[in-house]
Amino acid sequence: MKLTCVLVVLLLVLPFGDLIGVCSTPEGSCVHNGCICQNAPCCHPSGCNWVNVCPGFLWDRS
């Protein structure tokens, strides 16, 4: 039973791997306010997360 629970949790968490800083898609570009990304993930790999939001200090590099 415990193994089943662990497997279910892993299946739920794996699609959101970028929550822990794992970016699997190419860098995106941020809107110029430095917050919401136009493409996933955010403009800087350390800023990517599953809702495609950059912290305010990770500004658009362009």
Curated annotation (Swiss-Prot):
Keywords: Disulfide bond, Neurotoxin, Secreted, Signal, Toxin. It comes from the Eukaryota. It is found in: Secreted. Expressed by the venom duct. Contains 4 disulfide bonds. Residues 1-19 form the signal peptide. GO terms for molecular function: toxin activity. GO terms for cellular component: extracellular region. Belongs to the conotoxin O1 superfamily. Probable neurotoxin. The cysteine framework is XII (C-C-C-C-CC-C-C). This is Conotoxin Cal12.2e. It comes from Californiconus californicus. The lineage of its organism: Eukaryota, Metazoa, Spiralia, Lophotrochozoa, Mollusca.
